[in-house]
Regions:
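Active-site flanking residues adjacent to catalytic metal/cofactor-binding acidic residues
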Residues: 31, 74-76, 111
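Hydrophobic anchor at the beta1->P-loop junction of P-loop NTPases
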Residues: 6
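Conserved lysine of the Walker
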Residues: 14
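P-loop (Walker A) phosphate-binding loop of NTP-binding proteins
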Residues: 9
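Conserved substrate/cofactor phosphate-moiety recognition/catalytic segment
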Residues: 19-62, 164
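A glycine- and Lys/Arg-enriched "phosphate-lid" helix/loop adjacent to the NTP-binding pocket
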Residues: 89-159, 172
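Conserved nucleotide-sensing/catalytic segment adjacent to the nucleotide-binding pocket
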Residues: 44-90
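Pre-Walker A (Motif I) flank of P-loop NTPase domains
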Residues: 1-3, 69
């Protein structure tokens, strides 16, 4: 089983690319639990919600891992929960990082916020490119610090599609 994670700031194409990859390569796609959580609770999140959101994301991931697909595509993982918690609330539950480091991921596709427009969808909150660049930089710094396999994805939508497909194709060879 190969596990690919789409990482990076909001509105950089993670969900779109995850769907494109799954449609082309097959496997199982795990979505963002936080979106489900917000829809179910009909409110913004607060710091006290972070453990439930992170555990929900882990549960979805673990259910998919148990099926042992050849390819598991994660629209997000605990890094996003960890960084959003720090961004929005200045802190995060201490167990998130060790739990993230305890898991194996074969490839992180880290999407840059540059060269694509921000799109409001009712849940996004970083319309300014500078904020999304800070989130991208924090993601990259964490992945590099912890020697996680990553491929930075840049450019317009077509370029992102090509880069992501090539990276996953190489992983599956």
């Amino acid at each position: 089983m190969k596990v690919v994670v789409l990482a990076g700031p909001e509105s950089s194409g993670k969900s779109w690319l995850a769907e494109q990859l799954q449609a082309h390569f097959g496997g199982i796609l795990v979505g963002e639990y936080v979106r489900y959580f917000i829809e179910q609770n009909a409110r913004d999140t607060c710091f006290d919600d972070i453990p439930a959101i992170a555990r929900g994301q882990l549960d979805w991931e673990d259910q998919a891992r148990a099926l042992r697909p050849l390819l598991l595509i994660l629209d997000t993982h605990l890094l996003s929960n960890m960084l959003w918690s720090k961004t929005l609330f200045g802190d995060c539950p201490p167990w998130l990082e060790p739990e993230l480091l305890n898991r194996h991921y074969d490839l992180h596709l880290l999407l840059s916020p540059d060269d694509v427009e921000w799109t409001q969808d009712g849940q996004r909150c970083q319309p300014f490119l500078a904020d999304r660049q800070l989130f991208f930089n924090a993601s990259r710094q964490w992945l590099e610090l912890h020697q996680q396999p990553l491929q930075v994805i840049t450019g317009d939508w077509h370029a992102r599609h090509l880069q992501a497909f090539n990276a996953v194709k190489q992983l599956l060879v």
